Each structure stands twice: as structure tokens, then as C-alpha cells.
A protein has these predicted regions:
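Long, contiguous N-terminal structural blocks used for assembly/anchoring
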Residues: 1-77
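Residue-identity detector for threonine
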Residues: 13, 32, 50-52, 97, ...
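Amphipathic protein-protein interaction modules
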Residues: 57-130
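Long, highly charged low-complexity segments enriched in Glu/Asp and Lys/Arg with interspersed Ser/Thr
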Residues: 128-138
């Protein structure tokens, strides 16, 4: 890795919010390349483009602004909230509700979080022409 690449990665990801870090780690973990191998085999957080990191921060901030009180009430921290936000958004089968029993207040809150995350729609992680990772929506 070049010094420029190292500095870009360090400066770009060392300042990530906990939520955006969890969000991008989940995105990297579940995405696959054209051969079906997980992207985290060959890429790390420092490989996301600057624009993608900024967009992830904005999406996470927007989600947190609307939902932080809810996820903190049920004991979910910022990192896990970001992780679950990505997975629920993607329709992966993982849910904020997974840790709660039916009929509980926590389950009702978690269902609201799922609904909020799904509103963002699916997104896909793909390498761009510069070898960085971008997230495409729609």
C-alpha cells in the first residue's frame, strides 16, 4: 500500500463514528465479489471511498437522529445499531427484533427500528475504477 493510500485510509476511517464503523463493517462483511467471495477477504474499512464514508456518516446520523432514543432504550449501542441498520436495510434476514421476546415493549421498539431502517432501501458495495469501494443505492 502506498503512503498516500495509508494516509487516506487512516484519516478517512480513524474518525468514523461508532455507528458508521459498525455500518461499514457490516457492509463489507456481507458483500461479495463477482466470484462470490466476501469482500472483507480482500478489502478493509480503509478501502471505502471518501465519498462513501461521508454518505455512510450522513445516513447513520439521519438514522440516529430519528432513532437513537429507541435503540438506547433497548440496550443497543452505536456500533451494533450501525451494524443492524445495514443488515436490516439490506433485507438480510437479521433484525433489531432478534434478541427480544414477542409481546415485550422491547420487541415493539425493535419493530419500529426495523421499519425505519427498511425505508432506506437496499444498497450494494462494489469496487470502483480506482480500486476503492463505493455503496450504490437503488
Amino acid at each position: 500500500m502506498s503512503l498516500l493510500g495509508f494516509l487516506k485510509g487512516f484519516l478517512g476511517t480513524s474518525r468514523l463514528s461508532e455507528m458508521a464503523r459498525g455500518y461499514l463493517e457490516a457492509a463489507l462483511w456481507v458483500a461479495t465479489d463477482e466470484d462470490g467471495y466476501p469482500l472483507d477477504r480482500d478489502y478493509s474499512l480503509s478501502d471505502f471511498s471518501t465519498e462513501t464514508v461521508a454518505k455512510a456518516e450522513r445516513d447513520c446520523q439521519e438514522f440516529a437522529s430519528a432513532n437513537a432514543e429507541l435503540y438506547s432504550r433497548i440496550g443497543i449501542g452505536e456500533d451494533k445499531a450501525g451494524h443492524l441498520f445495514w443488515l436490516v436495510r439490506m433485507g438480510s434476514g437479521v433484525s433489531f427484533t432478534d434478541d427480544f421476546k414477542t409481546g415485550t415493549v422491547e420487541m415493539q421498539i425493535a419493530k419500529k427500528l426495523d421499519t425505519s431502517a427498511r425505508k432506506y432501501g437496499e444498497a450494494h458495495v462494489m469496487p470502483n475504477d480506482e480500486g476503492e469501494l463505493d455503496i450504490f443505492t437503488g
